Amino acid sequence: METSQETSLFLVKILEELDSKQNTVSYQDLCKSLCARFDLSQLAKLRSVLFYTACLDPNFPATLFKDKMKCTVNNQQSKKIMVAADIVTIFNLIQMNGGAAKEKLPTGRQKVRKKEASFESCRSDTEICNAAECEPLNCELSERSFSRGYPIRQSSKCRKMDCKDCPQFVPASEPNFLLGVSKEVKNRAASLDRLQALAPYSVTSPQPCEMQRTYFPMNIENESISDQDSLPINQSIKETFISNEEPFVVQSCVQKRNIFKEDFHNLMAVSPSLVGPISKAENEHREPQSRKEPHKPPFFNHSFEMPYNSQYLNPVYSPVPDKRRAKHESLDDLQASTYFGPTPVMGTQEARRCLGKPNKQTPWPAKSWSLNTEEVPDFERSFFNRNPSEEKLHYPNASSQTPNFPAPERRPTYLVPKDQQPILPIAYAAKQNGLKSKEISSPVDLEKHEPVKKFKDKSINCTSGQLSSDTSSVGTQTEHVLEPKKCRDLCTSGQGKYSDRHTMKHSDDDSEIVSDDISDIFRFLDDMSISGSTGVIQSSCYNSTGSLSQLHKSDCDSSPEHNLTKIANGVPNSKGDKGNRPENTHHSEEELKTSVCKLVLRIGEIERKLESLSGVRDEISQVLGKLNKLDQKMQQPEKVSVQIDLNSLTSEGPSDDSASPRMFHAHSGSHGPKLENNPDWCCSDASGSNSESLRVKALKKSLFTRPSSRSLTEENSATESKIASISNSPRDWRTITYTNRVGLNEEEIKDTGPGDNKDWHRKSKEADRQYDIPPQHRLPKQPKDGFLVEQVFSPHPYPASLKAHMKSNPLYTDMRLTELAEVKRGQPSWTIEEYARNAGDKGKLTALDLQTQESLNPNNLEYWMEDIYTPGYDSLLKRKEAEFRRAKVCKIAALIAAAACTVILVIVVPICTMKS
């Protein structure tokens, strides 16, 4: 005790120093000061405490610090600096974010409280609150809090003992308000809003302090600060933290918690009775671990006191009437309660119902917690994991005490309206919203994981069914009843995981889950469900929390609630639970889930962006098709005058005239919307953008480098043939159309003969420019298959509809002008040498010069169509040129021969004849 007390005082000292220097000393200086003045072990303990305290805040980015908590650096100095930096950062985050974490810090002086809150955070918000109350009383609860034991009720002794000794609560505005806890603390809410919320619990609990403990299910003792850095905290330490009345946390957090408690108490006023029995059983189980807290009945309060509770229950976040308010109204609500966070009121009401029925768990405890069986708040996890007995008490033993209530209260409290039922992995699954008591009683079996599974089967089926019927099941359980197996898995894995997983894992997972923007997650789920789901499993960012668990997008319904329902029903969690059941794999699996969830969210964002493009692409394809038709009509005179039989070349490309803009539209429709739903779509889209940039560059270069002697149409034909062979891409119709036109041009060229080659080349160039899209198809000719694929499947850099507006659009106009200015359309480069040689001429043309050029005339399709460097056509062009040269030589030779013959016939023959 002496050592623990000293440690507690020491930690409090550090926190006080941080608080005093927070606004006056730089971050680096604070870190240096901590490193210089404290040992690594001390700093590590403090970091652990702060981390778990901060984890109470759903907004806390636990994932950023989770790995660091486990980081093993050989260099002690470096590790010390890292730990100090983490301490300062976490401390600042707690101060800025306030909420449950900050409220917990005020247990002693607010700083001390903060540290204590860290321990308490390990316990639970409720416990922290209790600890805060008891801590002012120097209750054993403090020890329990630090020990991270859910036995917040254990702290009831402290409550009893300390409450007697503890001074009256100070005004809530005073950071030390938590310190002075007394039976009056029932009205402590007056001084501490969150305590006020507890006051209703206090009604059931002997003292507000007890209420708080009861309200905060997690005891630091039981939970241990963290699995790695569990900081054994004896009562003295807790008392020390408690004794420190320095306001460590901003009142706003406390007020939020108070508000939450008020709302919660509105719902949980009846729950104390429920909590009482449950808490008693839990306390009994916990007593070995920590002192029994007869007032543990408020265990629901503890669960409600969850870090999320303060925010969710806070009137600010979800006033009793507003607890059901828009899920997205409050990030805190959303994060803490996941998708159902905003429904605390109903949850509370249901919690009351549950309280009325000891077997029923209050859905309030943690909506997201109930949803995320695996991701229960640290205090819940510790509550379940700190001691197997506690776990049993809370989850498995919940049945004995209506254990569902203790844990479910924590979770269901939030979930009760919607989430709790699906969220309740086991006992929670037991209809917390008035689910059958037997469902809740089944948690007794839950103590036994198999019975828990059974319970899951029943209760989850019932839960999903009944919960769906139940108001608390609102979107979650009404949507889908988990399959018995899934429910079992969810519950079993949830409880097993809770009990098996270390508090730290729970807190870390919860923190990670909570740290994500739940509103974004739900929007993503909505998008995914609307888009048809990418088929990617949403790893349970909020597995246990219920915010997000592994949801197969196929499982996702149109509404995030539906998705959550499935999650709550354990559909995603069942898989996650199965995968996570091994304790050794749970943590990494949770991290993987978190990363996958983030990836899915990112994909969802991209998809949403792409969705807006699908319509545009369709329109562009249509416009482009029309432009191609018009262009063909315009080119008909040229074709008639200059028909070259290059169709042989174009014949290579399938003349899929059927591939009309409509076909392209269809393709875009199929690929666009489908791709949007498919992760590949993002890739294809990205490749499309890349290809576009490549095309733009190629266009610029090709504009300069193409020799007039070569026929762009020939290139287009060859390219089109390749493209056609490659795939029936949305652009195939463009390619085909262009190919046909090119074929005509080639025929014209052949018919025209070498003399008309220049004109034909000029016309073909114009045509090519007009058909800038076909050049894109030509790009596939390039050696790089990837680029070709991009060209084929990616959207055109200048869709017809887009080009129609390019003239007026400064973005496209400038780009076009720049490209034109850089390149004189005279000589496309057909070889790398030519390309490199002509590249230097890009910047020669000025804007005025460009404007004077016919190709730069916006009224001319050539203005909208640019040539692309197509090295693949070198051989083709050379072959053609060779043929033309041979034809010329043959003609010349023929002429010479004819002349010679004529001379012979005209001169020689007559002479000979005359001679003869």
Curated annotation (Swiss-Prot):
Q: Which residues carry this modification: Phosphoserine?
A: S711
This protein's record includes keyword Cell membrane: yes
Cellular compartments annotated:
Cell membrane
Q: Which residues cross the membrane?
A: 892-912
Q: Which InterPro entries match?
A: MINAR1-like, MINAR1-like_C, MINAR1_N
Please provide the Gene Ontology terms (biological process) for this protein: angiogenesis; negative regulation of angiogenesis; negative regulation of cell growth; negative regulation of cell population proliferation; negative regulation of neuron projection development; negative regulation of protein ubiquitination; negative regulation of TOR signaling
How the protein assembles, per its UniProt entry? Interacts with NOTCH2; this interaction increases MINAR1 stability. Interacts (via N-terminus) with DEPTOR (via PDZ domain); this interaction may stabilize DEPTOR protein by impairing its ubiquitination.
Q: What PANTHER family does the record tag this protein with?
A: MAJOR INTRINSICALLY DISORDERED NOTCH2-BINDING RECEPTOR 1, MAJOR INTRINSICALLY DISORDERED NOTCH2-BINDING RECEPTOR 1 MINAR1 FAMILY MEMBER
What name does UniProt use for this protein?
Major intrinsically disordered Notch2-binding receptor 1
Q: Which organism is it from?
A: Homo sapiens (Human)
